[in-house]
Amino acid sequence: MARKNQKAPWEPEEEIIWVSKSEMKRDMEELQKLGEELVGLKPAVLDKFPLSEDLREAVADAQRFKNEARRRQLQRIGKLMRYEDPEPIQAALDKIRNKHSQATAALHKLEALRDRVVEEGDKAIDDVMELYPEADRQRLRQLARQAAKEKKAGKPAKSYREIFQILKAFEEEM
């Protein structure tokens, strides 16, 4: 008579999480796409990422390869990414992406401030003086008047651009 196994190979308290094969494939494809994004970066930017030496070398190789060799190398990078923690890599990538959008948002803010200076005059210049106390109030007033005249006459917006350059210079100093 056969004896029944009294004890299971795992502890009953342990919860076993079964992952489907397609879910595993999706995870691997995500890692491969993350690797593709790394390949698209410049080497100077890539040096700032927390990558293992093998992965760094594989990414550098993929940047040199063309067509089919590149595709195979991207698969290799995906495989190497399985042994890496993707969170810090993804965080660094997000930081680089947001850097561009933050710079664009800052320029839009300066453009809006410039428009206010031209349209509202002294009231907006007072706001600029609060933001940038070292700004030359008289120069800003003069440029605002000139920009309004240029706009009215349909001339090129030389003063308009100069106001923006002044505001941009003060923003970069901060």
UniProtKB/Swiss-Prot annotation:
InterPro entries tied to this protein: DarP (IPR006839), DarP_sf (IPR023153)
Keyword Cytoplasm among UniProt keywords: yes
UniProt superkingdom: Bacteria
A GO cellular component annotation in the UniProt record: cytosol
SUPFAM superfamilies in UniProt: PSPTO4464-like (SSF158710)
GO terms for biological process, alphabetical: assembly of large subunit precursor of preribosome
GO molecular function, one term: ribosome binding
Family to which this protein belongs: Belongs to the DarP family.
Purpose of the protein: Member of a network of 50S ribosomal subunit biogenesis factors which assembles along the 30S-50S interface, preventing incorrect 23S rRNA structures from forming. Promotes peptidyl transferase center (PTC) maturation.
Name of this protein: Dual-action ribosomal maturation protein DarP
Originating organism: Vibrio campbellii (strain ATCC BAA-1116)
Gene name of this polypeptide: darP
